[in-house]
Design a protein with these regions (language model features):
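Asp-based, Mg2+/Mn2+-dependent phosphohydrolase catalytic module
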Residues: 1-113
């Protein structure tokens, strides 16, 4: 199996749904082999890493994938707080980052296009 989005869940509006990573996880648990692509795996960052003289900022709402991937590549990160971890608001930022063993450079409440 090829899993192009390792996230376990995704928020679509006000609804939280299982994501491709959940299917891949179950497939592995029953003995299947999964090749993962996407954050936090390095292949997705190759193009950004090859840009000389530029700074990279990884933006995402998932500490396990978006921010962990940035940390693994030594890129700066921006966590969007109204995403996957919004229900963990009882944590201070520092405790939340410690819980997931990540380092976050910047936080922002919401991201709109």
């Amino acid at each position: 199996m090829i899993c192009t989005n390792p996230d376990l869940v995704v928020d679509r509006g006000e609804k939280r749904e299982f994501c491709a990573g959940s299917i891949a996880k179950v497939f592995e648990e029953i003995g299947g082999k999964v090749n993962y692509f996407g954050k936090p795996y390095p292949l997705v960052y190759n193009q950004a890493a090859d840009v000389k003289g530029k700074k990279v900022l990884c933006i995402g709402d998932n500490l396990n994938t978006d921010i962990r991937g940035a940390n693994l590549q030594n890129f700066s990160s921006l966590l969007i707080l109204n995403g996957i971890h919004k229900n963990e608001a009882d944590y201070s930022y520092e405790k939340l980052f410690e819980k997931y063993n990540v380092s976050v450079n910047y936080v922002q409440t919401i991201l709109k296009w």
